[in-house]
Amino acid sequence: MLREFSKWGVEASPGKAWERKRSLLRGAVGRYRGATGGDLFWAPFPSWGTMEFPEHSQQLLQSLREQRSQGFLCDCTVMVGSTQFLAHRAVLASCSPFFQLFYKERELDKRDLVCIHNEIVTAPAFGLLLDFMYAGQLTLRGDTPVEDVLAAASYLHMNDIVKVCKRRLQARALAEADSTKKEEETNSQLPSLEFLSSTSRGTQPSLASAETSGHWGKGEWKGSAAPSPTVRPPDEPPMSSGADTTQPGMEVDAPHLRAPHPPVADVSLASPSSSTETIPTNYFSSGISAVSLEPLPSLDVGPESLRVVEPKDPGGPLQGFYPPASAPTSAPAPVSAPVPSQAPAPAEAELVQVKVEAIVISDEETDVSDEQPQGPERAFPSGGAVYGAQPSQPEAFEDPGAAGLEEVGPSDHFLPTDPHLPYHLLPGAGQYHRGLVTSPLPAPASLHEPLYLSSEYEAAPGSFGVFTEDVPTCKTCGKTFSCSYTLRRHATVHTRERPYECRYCLRSYTQSGDLYRHIRKAHNEDLAKRSKPDPEVGPLLGVQPLPGSPTADRQSSSGGGPPKDFVLAPKTNI
């Protein structure tokens, strides 16, 4: 015995032996193991650690699935509409807080049947969720929408399934948005534009001007039908014209046109509708600069087929010419046809290719705005080069009353209602103080669309003016707006008017806010630091309503209202 005590380091005293035993039991050295029924013998017990069996959970779920398929030990029936599902209450309560709360609130004798609202949770969706509870995998089938699974999971408070379904729906929405964007981009690239012109006698050859640009969006338009068929040389394939939809300044070479036709000028304009129109060469004098002339063989055109209509008052300015309004269309249908004018000699007949650069209307200031033309008429020389021999229009800052847009009604026109001009070449009010060339051929109804509201849409004096329609709609592009004032501001996009001009550098802008920012940035005007609106800001910028315009009449009668038509002139000290 003493040998055993000395072996374990314990004295023969029983009291000290018990103290040693207690110290060993308090520590993690080992366990007490009695020998021969005594409490004095100790031996350390080795620790084996935790042994894991990863297959246990899978085997448990597989066993539960087999029990559910056989109906073994199933103690609950879930009713979804008329469909019954056998399950185990323990599994349902473990996977869904909905069932856990349901079984806690119900008595033991009322837990056998659970009825779920079938208008929120569908039977196929609940079947998928029940399979997930027993398998740990969610399998989405084509006959069950993801939205139904999301609704069922939300009803049963299965948050993991809700997150997965939401991510799937968001990914699908992004994919649909991308496909829709690609489809819109594809639809925006229309076929190339083709315009047919005809003469008033004999067979009518086709005029087809083509541009070799393959990557631009193109659309196909045809003019008014001619009574005679189109004639084309048998050895030459038909030629189509491409629309110039690039930014202004992009030049494209046009091939020669071999089909016989009367002398016309092919004018490519970067219009708001991104189309190419063909207008007669008689619109321009022979002294036009910056155009490429391509002589063609002389054509036999009788002078009796052409005529010129001169304005009634050659000396006075032509008030705004806007044809009467007609049914709104999505885009104007430009038509090309020979317009009557003085017939040139057959030896002088030639084709003129004219590239007119349009203004890019933007709220941002550009550094090259001084070099760009301020309108379609800036591309031609003054002194009667366009629309007759009237003198050019004076600049806006020299005479505030000589420029700007005026709103006119259907009865305020001076020429017949069938002018055959491309839509965006129709002279706006006060734009061209020159003679207008008209055509004996009828023009389509889309050419009579006014850019601004006509008189029948104007409201009483003192108001902004409202539409007789339910929603204010642009007659040119079909866009709708919340109020008529916003529509009037939008109209400058189509007219390409820049009525606000800087009195320092003479740059023009579409909106008054753009001019204000330009002066504050470029000319160090400390206008932005004023805490309150300054009534002198308007006179400082030289913004005055056009005398005699409906805007001036409304402001004079009502004493207020946002401005609509302006002519920007420098401030004068009186």
Swiss-Prot record:
Family matches, as Gene3D superfamilies: Classic Zinc Finger, Potassium Channel Kv1.1, Chain A
Keywords, sorted A to Z: DNA-binding, Isopeptide bond, Metal-binding, Nucleus, Phosphoprotein, Repeat, Transcription, Transcription regulation, Ubl conjugation, Zinc, Zinc-finger
Region named Disordered: 175-277, 305-346, 364-403, 526-574
Entry's Gene Ontology BP terms: regulation of transcription by RNA polymerase II
MF annotations from Gene Ontology: DNA binding; DNA-binding transcription factor activity, RNA polymerase II-specific; zinc ion binding
Keyword Chloroplast: no
Record-listed Phosphoserine modification sites: 362, 549
A GO cellular component entry from the record: nucleus
Localization annotation: Nucleus
Amino acid composition bias (Low complexity), ranges on this chain: 323-334
Domain of life of the source: Eukaryota
Physiological role: May be involved in transcriptional regulation.
Span of domain BTB: 74-142
Comp. bias regions, Polar residues: 187-212
Organism from which the protein derives: Homo sapiens (Human)
Protein name, entry field: Zinc finger and BTB domain-containing protein 3
SUPFAM superfamilies xrefs: beta-beta-alpha zinc fingers, POZ domain
Pfam families reported for this sequence: BTB, zf-C2H2
Transmembrane segments: none
Crosslink position(s): Glycyl lysine isopeptide (Lys-Gly) (interchain with G-Cter in SUMO2): 181-182, 532
